[in-house]
Amino acid sequence: MFMTESRLTHLKQLEAESIHIIREVAAEFENPVMLYSIGKDSAVMLHLALKAFYPAKLPFPLLHVDTGWKFKDMIAFRDNMAKTHGFDLIVHQNKEGREAGINPFDHGSSKYTDIMKTQALKQALDKYQFDAAFGGARRDEEKSRAKERVYSFRDSKHRWDPKNQRPELWNLYNGKVNKGESIRVFPLSNWTELDIWQYIYLENIQIVPLYFSAVRPVVERSGTLIMVDDERMRLKEGEVPQMKSVRFRTLGCYPLTGAVESEADTLPEIIQEMLLATSSERQGRMIDHDEAGSMEKKKQEGYF
């Protein structure tokens, strides 16, 4: 007897939908890749992909765009996951940007993000000629992502046109692309932040320790707590790091990622926090505060 969709829990329905999308892409495209940002959404997406093809290995590689400014714990976690699961991991960095010394302090978050993230991603997609790329974005994160399709068409310059999106009826997706064009695929589109945390708890998925509360050195800038992760952190005159009990709801480059004061050091406690949260997790992403509509503008330029 087959289990109908109506008999599945909402998390199992989301899981089934995501696995269907991942398998569809693997079957439909010649050279797909999974973007691996090392965050909680990437952890769930990787877990779903491993489930989708178990006991076989993943039929596509993982790509991490390394800006050089990720948290140390993130890089250690990435390398450990690759070793544990044996997947093919591609690490790409914008060599020209690195040699030019592009950093979030001297060049600002907008220019830094464009060069070390957007341009680096486009370089990697062109270099390896990927025709589809999985990403862990969700529609509840931010308004420009809310209107993006599961299969997000990108032209030969990796640009997204929000006014020219393909219809998606039921679970049917149009993956037709010409040479040089590509599709960004978002299997977690219909998940919420709370869904992600509940699934991590139920499936016992490994995540970066930074998501759990611990006493860490931070400085407060414009109301945002920035963790001092290494000696490259530039302190302003008179600024002294304070030890506070904090955790992160979202992860990125450490000088541009805000922590939240919290005592939640277990998954049930994090889930309880999510039930009471009144702001988006991306409030902690300083790159989203550059200008009005900045995320949509970044996506039109090729950002994920």
UniProtKB/Swiss-Prot annotation:
Record's keyword terms, sorted: ATP-binding, Nucleotide-binding, Nucleotidyltransferase, Transferase
Domain of life: Bacteria
GO BP, sorted A to Z: hydrogen sulfide biosynthetic process; sulfate assimilation
InterPro entries named in the record: PAPS_reduct_dom, Rossmann-like_a/b/a_fold, SO4_adenylTrfase_ssu, Sulfate_adenylyltrnsfr_sub2
Pathway: Sulfur metabolism; hydrogen sulfide biosynthesis; sulfite from sulfate: step 1/3
SUPFAM superfamilies: Adenine nucleotide alpha hydrolases-like (SSF52402)
UniProt EC number: 2.7.7.4
Protein role: With CysN forms the ATP sulfurylase (ATPS) that catalyzes the adenylation of sulfate producing adenosine 5'-phosphosulfate (APS) and diphosphate, the first enzymatic step in sulfur assimilation pathway. APS synthesis involves the formation of a high-energy phosphoric-sulfuric acid anhydride bond driven by GTP hydrolysis by CysN coupled to ATP hydrolysis by CysD.
Name of protein: Sulfate adenylyltransferase subunit 2
Source organism of this protein record: Acinetobacter baumannii (strain AYE)
Upper taxonomic lineage: Bacteria, Pseudomonadati, Pseudomonadota, Gammaproteobacteria, Moraxellales
